């Protein structure tokens, strides 16, 4: 849903604002952990804490964008990996009964990769005027996460 879309874009934007190796290592860490979590959570019942974890991930990554926080690359990878567990489990428990797990995971990995890339590209093409827009986007993402958390 919208929560996953915003999270994937946000991770890409944040990684892109850090530049260098962070722009590909941080999204890659997210993708790998999300895929593993998705594979291992298939057939599990949905747990309400998963949706709360996704909402918190939006709040925190949105704040990282707003405040233009640049962490060491490994620390950034760890942060997004924790969030990726929630997103992966959410995808895994939603596996349709008739779907092939391999194709299903491949689909959400491809979609996530494209959304991360869009975020990285948007961040890489920023200028002084788009800095404000980038921070407003981060604020909207964080606010959406907060609203989702309150709704849970």
Predicted regions: what they are:
Residues 2-152:
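Membrane metalloprotein/metal-transporter helix-bundle signature
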């Amino acid at each position: 849903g919208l929560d996953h879309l915003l999270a994937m874009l946000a991770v890409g934007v944040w990684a892109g604002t850090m530049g260098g190796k962070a722009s590909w290592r941080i999204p890659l860490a997210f993708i790998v952990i999300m895929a593993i979590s998705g594979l291992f959570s298939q057939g599990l019942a949905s747990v309400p804490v998963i949706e709360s974890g996704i909402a918190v991930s939006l709040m925190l990554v949105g704040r990282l964008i707003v405040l233009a926080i640049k962490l060491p690359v490994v620390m950034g990878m760890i942060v997004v990996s924790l969030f990726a567990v929630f997103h992966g489990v959410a995808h895994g428990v939603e596996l349709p009964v008739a779907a092939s797990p391999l194709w299903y995971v491949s689909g959400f990995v491809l979609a996530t990769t494209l959304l991360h890339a869009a975020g990285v590209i948007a961040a890489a093409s920023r200028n002084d005027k788009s800095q404000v827009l980038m921070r407003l986007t981060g604020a909207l993402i964080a606010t959406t996460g907060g609203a989702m958390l309150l709704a849970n």
